[in-house]
Amino acid sequence: GWAGSLGPVDVDLGVLQFLYPGDNAAGAAEADATELYVGVAKDFGIASASIYYYNVVSTDAWGFADADGSEYWTLDVDVPVGDTPITASFHVGNQEFEGSGNEPYDYTDWKVNLDYALSDTYSAGIYYTDTDMTEDIWTVQGEFLGQDSVGAYLSASF
């Protein structure tokens, strides 16, 4: 991929390849997938925002047949909370599957996150995430994949 600045915005372009080892179940669509993506980001001072677009270019993807052209959009906004080490982050994404019979699997996801910078290297946070996935479609082996969740984390970046 490539990332850089074009005028007042940061741009990110690339290819993502998802490879899943092992054989597919008999008659199942390929799980491996290839996506092209483009993203733009801007820091507005009081907040920063990014928009990303992902497009599947492989025939099958993640077990969905004829998924070529499936799209995922994201919008992310980060808002520093005053002069504190806290940042509030908001995410919304929308997945639309191409292919005959794949439309019922379309969904929107969202996340709200509070991050506390402990230092230049470490941060801790909490988040809430959810989707509008349909439970009868997105339940696999008794587990609903679109279940809302609350979590906490400790992160290090260097």
Q: Across the structure, where does each feature detected by a protein language model lie?
A:
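Surface-exposed loop and membrane-interface regions of Gram-negative outer-membrane beta-barrel proteins
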Residues: G1-D32, P104, Q141-G142
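Residue-level signature of outer-membrane beta-barrel architecture
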Residues: W2-L6, Q17, V40-K42, V77-V81, ...
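Repeated loop/turn-to-beta-strand initiation elements of outer-membrane beta-barrel proteins
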Residues: L6-L13, F44-I51, D83-S89, D120-I126
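Residues that define the transmembrane beta-barrel architecture of outer-membrane proteins
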Residues: V9, E30-L36, A67-W73, D106-W110, ...
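Membrane-embedded beta-strands of outer-membrane beta-barrel proteins
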Residues: L13, L36-V38, L75-V77, V112, ...
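Sequence/structural signature of outer-membrane beta-barrel proteins
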Residues: L16-A25, Y54-G63, G93-G101, D109, ...
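Hydrophobic, well-structured mid-protein blocks that either form specific transmembrane helices
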Residues: L16-W73
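Outer-membrane beta-barrel "beta-signal"
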Residues: V112, Y116, E143-F158
